[in-house]
Design a protein with these regions (language model features):
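Iron-sulfur-cluster electron-transfer modules
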Residues: 1-105, 221, 228, 233-262, ...
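Short boundary motifs at domain starts and secondary-structure transition points
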Residues: 8-12, 113, 138-140, 217-223
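Short beta-strand segments
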Residues: 20-22, 151, 298
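Short, glycine-/Ser/Thr-/acidic-enriched flexible segments
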Residues: 25-26, 92-94, 155, 171, ...
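Hydrophobic alpha-helical positions that pack around
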Residues: 61-172, 178-185, 193
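Ubiquitin system architectures
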Residues: 181-227, 232-233, 243
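N-terminal glycine-rich "phosphate-gripper" loop used for MgATP/nucleotide binding
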Residues: 296-305
């Protein structure tokens, strides 16, 4: 997230290419991208056309989850006279918004972890970014505003609060107060999504890449129970998972990486095939061998499903890194696979 749009659009496709618009709103519980498509579809589509013109792309595909029926209907109406812009329906699983997953779902091309979308003659751009491109060209407006979702353990309930055009630099605390304030005790405040966000503070400023502010339920106290950590490229890194282990008052005794979490030269990890799991039995066996009572996992929808296929049978108690947030936003926990 945050890669400069100007650099992306400097592709100069000579024989045509694709603008792939990521409207998946990949992280669970977020609503601002879909709300903008419902309210300002023309601005988003105008931005898509400008991105096509700048890059030389001759086609565009808007990738959106099929569960968002109202937004899909609005897009279909707006695109009926746009032969070069189509939409593609995505399943409601995480991480359908990962850029290589978008390429795979829209074009049927499986990219290696080290490859960029340009290897598939495509550029992946978020739907909000498309609208900002339209503002920059048509209104000569610099990019200093952000759409985001505030949600969680707030006064007034767990429904999403969508704030549009929030100035970058606004504090986390100010936005939480606009959403009603925190309801009593809570676990942590996360800036970003439940999977890839980081813990933050009330005085921290939002940035151009902030998509959400989430207030979690309090953490369970595991009273020093032994815990294994399963790190997935689609979720929190090892340091984030260690932080959560401590917040649950557990003792780390083992950690493993999903075998698809390929380490990149910069030390980060990317999933070999995002959203498609190879199975997690070997990691669960290691956790069992290391005498873990609990395991905390940061896996995608499919990988979480495979963890659950064997982990509980081995006596392992499974916690997902998003549990404390999913409970706060009234979202199903990531365990067995649900696809819509």
């Amino acid at each position: 997230a945050g890669f400069p749009t100007a650099v992306k659009l400097d592709a100069h496709f000579e024989d045509g290419g694709y603008i792939l618009v990521n409207a998946s709103e990949c992280e669970p519980g977020l609503k601002h991208n879909i709300q903008q498509i419902e309210e300002e579809p023309e601005k988003v589509i105008r931005g898509v056309k400008l991105c096509m013109e700048i890059s030389g792309a001759d086609k565009a595909i808007i990738a959106i989850k099929k569960k968002n029926r109202k937004a899909v209907e609005i897009l279909d109406e707006c695109l009926k006279d746009e032969p070069n812009i189509t939409r593609h329906l995505l399943p409601d699983i995480y991480p359908m918004g990962e850029e290589r997953a978008v390429v795979r779902e829209c074009l049927g091309i499986e990219l290696e972890p080290s490859q960029l979308p340009s290897a598939a003659k495509s550029i992946v751009i978020n739907s909000e970014t498309c609208s900002r491109v339209a503002e920059a060209v048509d209104e000569r407006k610099p990019s200093f505003l952000k759409h985001l979702t505030v949600r969680g353990k707030l006064n007034g309930g767990h429904d999403a609060h969508v704030f549009m055009d929030v100035p970058v630099g606004t504090s986390v605390g100010a936005l939480i107060e606009r959403a009603g304030g925190i309801d009593g005790e809570y676990g942590e405040i996360v800036m970003g999504g439940a999977f890839t966000g980081k813990s933050t503070t009330l005085d921290a400023p939002i940035t151009k890449t902030t998509g959400a502010i989430l207030v979690s339920m309090p953490f369970m106290d595991l009273h020093g129970a032994s815990m294994g950590i399963l790190v997935c490229a689609c979720g929190g890194n090892y340091e984030r998972m260690q932080e959560l282990c401590k917040k649950y008052n557990a003792k780390e005794v083992s950690h493993c990486y999903c075998k698809q979490a390929q380490e990149m030269p910069n030390g980060s990890r990317k999933c070999e095939r995002p959203g498609n799991c190879p199975g997690q039995v070997s990691n669960n066996l290691q956790f069992k061998k290391d005498k873990c009572e609990y395991i905390i996992i940061g896996n995608c929808s499919d990988c979480s499903n495979t963890v659950m296929a064997s982990g509980p049978k081995m006596g392992l108690k499974v916690i997902h890194q998003t549990d404390h947030i999913m409970r706060a936003v009234d979202h199903p926990l990531y365990r067995t696979l649900r696809v819509s």
